């Protein structure tokens, strides 16, 4: 504040040497001095633009971008609920909304709830999880929207059991399937969602869902010598996690895993040794 006062005095006196020496003041300090809007106000203003039917698509995209930067701050993310802004964000996931705004909405959700138990709890009370699962389950969903949707779901479920319960209730396991989709970016996001599911442990119901979804079969299908190394490593890590939680592998799953491990033997020096050893113990 002293520096700001010195800068103000130098401006009034026209002392160019002092102005040059002091440099430009902190913009946030200037906002406080001259009554600029605080961050909660900026958040409200951004949402107002997004909801304004007269605003251009470009203006709405800019507003969403600014909003996401603001809610990277934990306090601001928690203020989404305090200011009753969750419904406005979730509404942007609707089918009739322009595609870019749906992508922004999913991205904002993922950023807000990531490693944030309060925001996870607040979001889980909305219709957002159901809408995200619907988007992720639709084969016609564009890739960029699918990626952000899976990111949001993963962030919402990680270390938060109620979100997984919501996931099951809305048939979320349908998004983890033996799809012919070979896009490694989508696979990585699907695997991240599985990792989030396992972050809250394993019980009988979850084991049953894993078997019904043929998750192990899906994981093993990724273990190929020509596969994407990042996907292979993530799949191995999940298999290792399943073993850690005492998942009961069937004889068929073990046989297929053995075949998969043979496929990636030549890649062993590029994979995490601990996960590889854990997977090999399952088939030994």
UniProtKB/Swiss-Prot annotation:
<feature type="repeat" description="ARM 1">
    <location>
        <begin position="13"/>
        <end position="55"/>
    </location>
</feature>
<feature type="repeat" description="ARM 5">
    <location>
        <begin position="204"/>
        <end position="244"/>
    </location>
</feature>
<dbReference type="GO" id="GO:0006417">
    <property type="term" value="P:regulation of translation"/>
</dbReference>
<comment type="similarity">
    <text>Belongs to the FES1 family.</text>
</comment>
<dbReference type="InterPro" id="IPR013918">
    <property type="entry name" value="Nucleotide_exch_fac_Fes1"/>
</dbReference>
<feature type="repeat" description="ARM 3">
    <location>
        <begin position="117"/>
        <end position="158"/>
    </location>
</feature>
<comment type="function">
    <text>Functions as a nucleotide exchange factor (NEF) for Hsp70 chaperones which accelerates the release of ADP. Required for fully efficient Hsp70-mediated folding of proteins.</text>
</comment>
<feature type="repeat" description="ARM 2">
    <location>
        <begin position="74"/>
        <end position="114"/>
    </location>
</feature>
<keyword id="KW-0963">Cytoplasm</keyword>
<dbReference type="GO" id="GO:0005783">
    <property type="term" value="C:endoplasmic reticulum"/>
</dbReference>
<protein>
    <recommendedName>
        <fullName>Hsp70 nucleotide exchange factor FES1</fullName>
    </recommendedName>
</protein>
<dbReference type="Pfam" id="PF08609">
    <property type="entry name" value="Fes1"/>
</dbReference>
<keyword id="KW-0810">Translation regulation</keyword>
<dbReference type="InterPro" id="IPR011989">
    <property type="entry name" value="ARM-like"/>
</dbReference>
<dbReference type="InterPro" id="IPR050693">
    <property type="entry name" value="Hsp70_NEF-Inhibitors"/>
</dbReference>
<keyword id="KW-0677">Repeat</keyword>
<dbReference type="GO" id="GO:0000774">
    <property type="term" value="F:adenyl-nucleotide exchange factor activity"/>
</dbReference>
<dbReference type="GO" id="GO:0071629">
    <property type="term" value="P:cytoplasm protein quality control by the ubiquitin-proteasome system"/>
</dbReference>
<dbReference type="InterPro" id="IPR016024">
    <property type="entry name" value="ARM-type_fold"/>
</dbReference>
<dbReference type="GO" id="GO:0005829">
    <property type="term" value="C:cytosol"/>
</dbReference>
<feature type="repeat" description="ARM 4">
    <location>
        <begin position="161"/>
        <end position="199"/>
    </location>
</feature>
